[in-house]
Amino acid sequence: MKLALKIDVDTYRGTRQGAPRLVDILKARNAGASFLFSLGPDHTGRAITRVFRAGFLRKVRRTSVLEHYGIKTLLYGTLLPAPDIGRECAGIMRDVRDAGFEVGIHAWDHVLWQDNVARADAQW
């Protein structure tokens, strides 16, 4: 049996800190993966509007949001300016590719995409 591992990297912190760590872990285990990166602004803080959606608070309680994302990430696009992931982390993305992993685009603005994809028409 073969398994495929797809890693969505949606935040500035995830690109700068998480992706290189995952590369090291995967290389040590001779495992492959496809990394899909968000390339535009990290607007993670704008996800706060999801607090009004059913199930969101349950998810927040179940996962350690602050620990996983960090306070700065949770403020990007609201109280802190959104860093441009693609511009500031292009070298890291190339490093992931050069380490032998497949690299692709997940979204431009992950929060914008996630909040609009369900009601998008074909032209979108």
Locate the predicted segments by residue.
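Catalytic alpha-helical scaffold of carbohydrate-active enzymes acting on polysaccharides/glycoconjugates
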Residues: 1-124
